[in-house]
């Protein structure tokens, strides 16, 4: 029974019971009067009975003859009357006529909303820094998602020029309350807010796909930690390098390309050193996979995988390569050409330089306050698939860290509860060691000094050993930050925080502007549904709903449903989005006057009808400064957009000035992040050589150059083809101990090749070290 019905029944009982008791008492007194004055008629007896109640209220006993039958009869009459009234009420029962056609309305109780959903909770204001901003009046707490019972995902839709960056992304960036990964079309956001973040102690990084030389390096291989990661990487790559118009229901060609790519990437990951793991070497290996349907001779790539199979017959790379080779030669040749065309971007010098090394450090985005800007070319760029690969790996690494090892991390917090440094640990044993390191860091930080760094232009606090503690834009801000660490700093295990430590130390927020240009992220709809518990949130920012429907044709509604807040900034002539928003707003019941005219005159009538709160045509003419916010399980709000200059930190942003990315600054912060880690062994400095030794060295270089040319062209110095197989690298005197016969392996291990190349730096560059036929762990053990 509902609460409303319960209250109605209680009220009816409170009214009915006193009336019933009065009627029974009146009946008893009336029967006494009839016994004393039998000549009175029925109505006169009732009147005298009522007067007798006033004169003798307690004269009930003894009962007059026939009183029992009279009471029973009165009770039956009252019961029958009540039954008739109840049945009639049921027959007349109906819905509220003012809401029967729809009860939608606009959210107006802002004070109540702020108390429930914004920081500080319980107060009628929304001026806390731990809020997300949607409009001038609607905010949402990021610090207490469990209390507000909302996830922090948002779906933002607005046509070109509607203010997606200016009225939504910008104000939320100025909150500076978490780590941000921001899609930045044309780079305007980095220029406007980069220095603001830097002066507040953020690590500012940039993946620039428009001008690649003006950003950090991103090597996808760095974030591969298992063969499963290889499959995910290849799936993302193939999905986002296949033009939509060429996709068909026959997956044979794409699956075959995946087999070859998985085999090569798995080979590099499992059997070569870190320096060799990049897409430049993927392309080099592909060029070694020469296939001729009229010539059954094996290619260099075939020999490489034969060697790998001899060492690791059940290897993942071997299995995929053998499955690829089951096709006919002509088919394999077509597949190889398709793969080369698909990956042609990696032959460009800019892309090669971008992906050969990595300093973007995605693993640290959830460990320290970071602002990563992903700059995309205006419109659809040929390199945007790199962004989808990066986002896919970012999700995977964050999930893996939060689920498996984040609970072991030790955190150094300042007096305000803000994270200063995260010491990551993989196991319980390591957690104890990291705690000691964190305590040592905090102790050293208490003796830190403030200095101005000419490279970065920032004021930084450094320990006596030169370890970076924190940095800010001004000396005053740096002193304040250091003071908060020295006076109130403490060490905290991540597991002592919420969710048993299964969360990132710093909330990670992805503002995916121009979402349609990023490319398709594998299983993105599943990630959006589960990111909340890991301290991750996503804002999907689109120009129209059609973009989401085209990208995720089967799952777009699931994506939209997992965003607890929808923000509509206006869409012009976009009818698809307007109809969808109109349906979300719902209908309200309105009284409509109908007027009709005929020959005999006219008539009017009033009817209640369900009318859209805002029809699609009304949404099309929504004023430029207004927006609509649709929170989960609440009425929608229509009001003013948030104007960026109204933010209390806008003056700070303007004062900070424009940001220009600097290679020197990026290198400094990368070195500072890894300062204190065990250094890799450096190559010994060669002793000074005599002129005779230099001559021998020059001769060895000449011989090595000839051997390399033989290996490349598969022929000897006289131009005669090598019928069996190319001679092994490193056959020159002094390069290896002993001579290798023609029946030996095609080439030596990567360590042998590397040793040779290190001794001949004039001839070989470090990036030329490509091939290997031994597991990577064997190299580290022999080094």
Task: Specify the residue positions occupied by each region the protein language model found.
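Basic- and hydrophobic-enriched, low-structure N-terminal and domain-boundary segments
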Residues: 1-162, 166-171, 213, 426, ...
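Conserved ATP-driven motor cores of ASCE-family P-loop NTPases powering translocation/secretion/packaging/pilus
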Residues: 418, 528-530, 534-628
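A short glycine-/small-residue-rich loop at the edge of a beta-strand within enzyme catalytic domains
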Residues: 119-122, 385, 515, 572
């Amino acid at each position: 029974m509902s609460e409303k019905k319960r209250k109605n029944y209680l009220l009816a009982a409170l009214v009915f019971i006193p009336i019933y008791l009065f009627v029974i008492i009146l009946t008893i007194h009336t029967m006494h009067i009839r016994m004393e004055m039998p000549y009175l008629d029925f109505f006169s007896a009732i009147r005298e009975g009522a007067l007798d109640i006033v004169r003798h209220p307690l004269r009930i006993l003894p009962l007059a003859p026939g009183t029992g039958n009279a009471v029973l009869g009165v009770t039956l009459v009252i019961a029958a009357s009540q039954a008739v009234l109840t049945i009639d009420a049921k027959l007349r029962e109906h819905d509220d006529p003012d809401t029967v056609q729809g009860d939608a309305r606009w959210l107006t109780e802002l004070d109540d909303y702020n108390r429930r959903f914004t920081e500080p909770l319980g107060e009628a204001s929304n001026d806390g820094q731990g809020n997300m901003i949607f409009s001038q009046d609607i905010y949402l707490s990021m610090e207490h998602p469990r209390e507000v019972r909302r996830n922090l995902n948002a779906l933002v839709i607005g046509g070109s020029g509607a203010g997606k960056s200016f009225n939504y992304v910008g104000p939320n960036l100025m909150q500076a309350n978490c780590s941000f990964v921001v899609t930045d079309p044309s780079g305007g956001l980095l220029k406007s807010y980069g220095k603001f973040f830097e002066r507040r102690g953020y690590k500012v990084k940039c993946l620039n796909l428009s001008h690649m030389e003006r950003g950090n390096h991103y090597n996808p291989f760095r974030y591969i930690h298992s063969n499963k990661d290889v499959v995910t990487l290849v799936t993302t790559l193939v999905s986002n390098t296949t033009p939509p118009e060429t996709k068909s229901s026959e997956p044979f060609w794409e699956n075959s390309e995946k087999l070859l790519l998985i085999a090569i990437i798995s080979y590099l990951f499992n059997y070569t050193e870190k320096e060799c793991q990049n897409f430049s070497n993927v392309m080099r290996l592909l060029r070694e996979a020469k296939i001729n349907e009229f010539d059954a001779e094996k290619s260099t790539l075939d020999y490489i995988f034969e060697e790998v199979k001899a060492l690791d017959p059940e290897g993942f790379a071997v299995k995929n390569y053998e499955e690829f080779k089951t096709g006919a030669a002509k088919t394999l040749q077509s597949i190889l050409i398709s793969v080369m065309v698909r990956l042609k971007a990696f032959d460009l010098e800019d892309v090669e330089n971008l992906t050969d090394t990595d300093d973007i450090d995605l693993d640290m985005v959830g460990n320290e306050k970071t602002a990563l800007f992903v700059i995309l070319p205006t419109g659809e760029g040929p390199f945007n698939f790199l962004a989808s690969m990066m986002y896919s790996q970012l999700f995977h690494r964050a999930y893996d860290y939060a689920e498996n090892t984040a609970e072991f991390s030790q955190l150094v917090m300042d007096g305000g509860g803000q994270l200063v440094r995260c010491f990551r640990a993989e196991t319980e044993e390591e957690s104890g060691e990291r705690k000691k390191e964190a305590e040592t860091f905090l102790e050293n930080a208490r003796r830190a000094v403030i200095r101005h760094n000419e490279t970065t232009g920032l004021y930084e606090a450094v320990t006596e050993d030169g370890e970076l503690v924190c940095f800010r834009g001004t000396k005053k801000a740096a002193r304040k930050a250091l003071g908060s660490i020295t006076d109130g700093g403490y060490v905290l295990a991540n597991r002592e925080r919420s969710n048993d430590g299964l969360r990132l130390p710093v909330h990670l927020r992805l503002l995916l502007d121009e979402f349609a240009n990023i490319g398709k992220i594998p299983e993105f709809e599943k990630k959006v549904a589960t990111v909340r518990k890991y301290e991750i949130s996503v804002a999907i920012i689109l120009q129209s709903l059609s973009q989401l429907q085209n990208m995720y044709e089967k799952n777009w509604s699931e994506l939209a449903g997992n965003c607890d807040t929808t923000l509509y900034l206006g869409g012009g002539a976009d009818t698809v989005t307007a109809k969808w928003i109109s349906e979300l707003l719902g209908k309200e019941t309105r009284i409509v006057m109908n007027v009709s005219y005929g020959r005999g005159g006219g008539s009017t009538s009033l009817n209640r009808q369900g009318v859209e709160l805002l029809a699609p045509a009304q949404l099309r003419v929504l004023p430029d400064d207004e927006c609509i916010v649709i929170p989960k399980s609440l009425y929608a709000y229509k009001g003013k957009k948030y104007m960026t200059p109204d933010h209390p930190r806008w003056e700070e942003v303007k004062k900070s000035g424009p940001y220009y990315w600097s290679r020197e600054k990026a290198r400094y912060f990368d070195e500072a992040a890894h300062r204190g880690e065990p250094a890799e062994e450096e190559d010994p400095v060669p002793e000074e050589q005599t002129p005779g030794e230099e001559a021998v060295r020059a001769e060895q270089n000449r011989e090595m150059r000839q051997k390399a040319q033989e290996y490349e062209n598969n022929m000897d110095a006289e131009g005669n083809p090598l019928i069996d197989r190319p001679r092994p690298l490193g056959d020159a005197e002094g390069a290896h101990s002993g001579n290798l016969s023609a029946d030996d392996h095609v080439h030596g291990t990567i360590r042998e090749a590397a040793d040779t190349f290190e001794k001949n730096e004039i001839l070989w560059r470090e990036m030329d070290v490509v091939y290997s036929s031994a597991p990577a762990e064997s190299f580290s053990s022999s080094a």
